[in-house]
């Protein structure tokens, strides 16, 4: 996906990028490739691939979730900033918080945020299980995102505690998510959520399947969740 295709593809979805925003994406790409030589951020480094599989893929969440109505977003396990930072570039009013367990990545994100001239971004080096118990962050966010970092049953325990009541948890998944959704239903219900919609679409050009799962927070998460670090992954809430 070249820059013209990227711009036109977003335009079709009602997202018009300014020259400044296009510069931000260009800087993002340059920093990603440069820092990737020092640390493992991504296996995808070819420009057309980055624009398609990282930038466009991240922004695709906004085709189904109205981020214009959101104010606060938390991204769990964002790695090199996906999906939250491409979303932030497109919707600059958002206050974005990223939590990641690797301090090197947090250092990269802090530097990147400055280079992109982003405002209202915060980066935390922490485990999601610990972060979700913090009074400052628990049930504080309009929307929480996660992109393919774990199974849905595990992700729900890491993410739903951070979502405020009536807010959304948005999980971005690659191939068919049917099995994950089925095994994740118990965890979602236990943690106060309910699946609102599942959007399946084809990523342009390469036509690979993507799924965006939108979960609404209906009630408070019980105080015992999330459990201690590592437990959600070892013993997911599955029925």
UniProtKB/Swiss-Prot annotation:
A GO molecular-function annotation:
rRNA (guanine-N7-)-methyltransferase activity
Give the chief site where it resides.
cytoplasm
Family matches, as NCBIfam families: rsmG_gidB
Q: Keywords on this record?
A: Cytoplasm, Methyltransferase, rRNA processing, S-adenosyl-L-methionine, Transferase
Q: Which organism is it from?
A: Bacillus licheniformis (strain ATCC 14580 / DSM 13 / JCM 2505 / CCUG 7422 / NBRC 12200 / NCIMB 9375 / NCTC 10341 / NRRL NRS-1264 / Gibson 46)
Which EC numbers characterise this protein's activity in its record?
2.1.1.-
Q: Which gene encodes it?
A: rsmG
Q: Where does S-adenosyl-L-methionine bind?
A: 77, 82, 128-129, 147
Q: What does this protein do?
A: Specifically methylates the N7 position of guanine in position 535 of 16S rRNA.
Q: Name one Pfam family in it.
A: GidB
- Lineage, top-rank taxon, reads Bacteria
Q: Which HAMAP family match?
A: 16SrRNA_methyltr_G
> Can you say where in the cell this protein is located?
Cytoplasm
Q: Which InterPro entries does the protein's record reference? A: rRNA_ssu_MeTfrase_G, SAM-dependent_MTases_sf
Which protein family is it in? Belongs to the methyltransferase superfamily. RNA methyltransferase RsmG family.
Q: Which CDD domains match?
A: AdoMet_MTases
Its GO CC terms are:
cytosol
Signal peptide as annotated in the record: none
Q: What is this protein called?
A: Ribosomal RNA small subunit methyltransferase G
């Amino acid at each position: 996906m070249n820059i013209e295709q990227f711009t036109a593809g977003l335009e079709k979805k009602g997202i018009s990028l300014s020259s400044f925003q296009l510069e931000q994406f260009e800087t993002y790409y340059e920093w990603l490739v440069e820092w990737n030589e020092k640390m493992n951020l991504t296996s995808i480094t070819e420009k057309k691939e980055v624009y398609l599989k990282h930038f466009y893929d991240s922004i695709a969440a906004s085709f189904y979730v109205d981020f214009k109505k959101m104010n606060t977003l938390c991204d769990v396990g964002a790695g090199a900033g996906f999906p939250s930072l491409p979303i932030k570039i497109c919707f600059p009013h958002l206050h974005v918080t990223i939590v990641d367990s690797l301090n090197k990545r947090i250092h990269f994100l802090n530097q990147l945020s400055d280079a992109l001239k982003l405002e209202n971004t915060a980066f935390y080096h922490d485990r999601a299980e610990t972060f979700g118990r913090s009074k400052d962050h628990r049930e504080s966010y309009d929307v929480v995102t996660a992109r393919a970092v774990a199974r849905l049953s595990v992700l729900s325990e890491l993410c739903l505690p951070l979502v405020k009541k009536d807010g959304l948890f948005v999980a971005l998944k690659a191939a068919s998510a049917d099995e994950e959704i089925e095994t994740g239903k118990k965890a979602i219900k236990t943690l106060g959520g309910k699946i609102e919609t599942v959007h399946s679409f084809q990523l342009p050009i390469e036509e690979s399947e993507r799924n965006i799962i939108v979960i609404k927070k209906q009630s408070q998460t019980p105080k015992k969740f999330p459990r201690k670090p590592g437990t959600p992954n070892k013993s997911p809430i599955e029925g």
